[in-house]
């Protein structure tokens, strides 16, 4: 069976979510680290890490450490967006995550990025790409996705 949990920083978003029974509302800046008592196969974090100040990195990495594998995307410098307080480079995120007990899996990252692009180009895609002006590879993972292995759990 498939089981998952979500972590959201906004009370309002948590309340409005259709699946709020599996979402934990948690602010990594004010609530500290969040650790789950169970281990998950995968932690998936899309366009989140740039929303937390660098001083609180350990707080959300504690959540990531509850999974055997980690896939993240990040906002690049000057991407701009609501509460983007830590836009940074790929090298920065590689250093931050690997220095906290994960191993970067370059081969899997490359494969997942390629698969993301293939899915985007697939005419059966649920998103009508013709209506998205100027997007050559719109899915975040295609250009800013990173995949890691958790050395502590593998």
Task: Give the residues covered by each predicted segment.
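Core SAM-dependent methyltransferase catalytic element
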Residues: 118-154
């Amino acid at each position: 069976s498939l089981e998952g949990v979500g972590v959201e920083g906004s009370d309002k978003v948590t309340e409005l979510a259709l699946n709020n029974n599996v979402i934990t509302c948690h602010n990594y800046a004010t609530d500290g680290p969040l650790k789950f008592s169970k281990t998950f196969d995968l932690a998936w974090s899309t366009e989140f890490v740039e929303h937390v100040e660098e001083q609180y990195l350990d707080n959300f990495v504690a959540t990531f450490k509850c999974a055997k594998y980690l896939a993240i995307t990040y906002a690049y410098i000057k991407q701009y967006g609501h509460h983007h307080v830590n836009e940074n480079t790929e090298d920065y995120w590689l250093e931050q995550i690997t220095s906290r007990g994960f191993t970067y899996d370059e081969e899997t990252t490359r494969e997942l990025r390629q698969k993301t692009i293939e899915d985007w180009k697939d005419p059966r895609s649920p998103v009508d790409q013709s209506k998205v002006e100027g997007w050559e590879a719109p899915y975040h993972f295609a250009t800013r996705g990173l995949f890691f292995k958790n050395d502590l759990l593998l």
